[in-house]
Structures are given as C-alpha cells and as structure tokens.
Amino acid sequence: MNDFRPNPSLLLETSWEVCNKQGGIYTVLTSRAHEMMKRHDGRIIFIGPLLTEQEDFPTDFENTVPAILEDWHRDAAPSLDLRYVCGSWRTPGSPPVVLVDFEPLYAQKATLYYEMWEHFGIQSDKGYGDYDEASLFGIAAAQTMHSLCEYP
C-alpha cells in the first residue's frame, strides 16, 4: 500500500461560488473549508469572482488582507492588470480569499478565444449564455494562480 500523502506548499481552489452563493457548490466549499485549513496548515487560498465595482463586498467576505497574501497583494497583484481584493471568507476556518475582477478581459476576448482555439481546439463561437463570463473568470483565475505560484 502506498502511504504517499502530498503536502503542497500552497493549495489553490477556485470557484464561481467563492463568496458568491449561487447554489450547492457554495455549501460544499464552506462545509469543508475549516478542515482544509487544518489539514494544510492554513496554506490554502480560495479564488472567486469580484462582482462589484464598489466597496460593497459580499456579506461573507472580510475585507482585511490575510498574512499569507500580504506580500503578494503588495508586490505582485498590481502588475497583473486586473483588480484584486484580498480578504477572508466568513465561514468556519476563515480561509484566505482572492476575489478577481475579470471584466477587463472583455477587451481582449477575441485574442484570448483565438489563443484557446489555436492551442486547445476550443471553439468559443459555439458558446452561449454565460459562456463569456465563465470563460473570462476562468482565465483571470488561472492568471491569479500562476502569479501566486510564481511569487517567491
């Protein structure tokens, strides 16, 4: 039997429902956040969408930058050309959260979709409904994850 247990230096989880209750995924995320914080010594960061232009944040979001995000928020986030708000999720375990505003990516949508088609064969012209919103949030979340992983 293999006793391997991965111990990542940082665990990142992204979802449309981080600090944005829409359905059942929110319940799944909040119900296990405390246990994940314990198991990973607080080295987990949740990434969700920033859906407001004002300082009117979700009621379950604490707008105080957690220690694990202070340096990244100060040094790296400003260079990414996206608006970020760092804080904690008001749920058991109070996990750190990065909310990312993906709206600026709409200006680059055609280029981003072309790159997805060219590299991965994704036919974005077949998307409908909230395709753009979900896709652009996914790209913004991936950029955020990359930055967090590359940050010293």
What are these regions (language model features)?
Residues M1-P152:
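Catalytic cores of nucleotide-sugar-dependent glycosyltransferases that transfer UDP/GDP/TDP-activated
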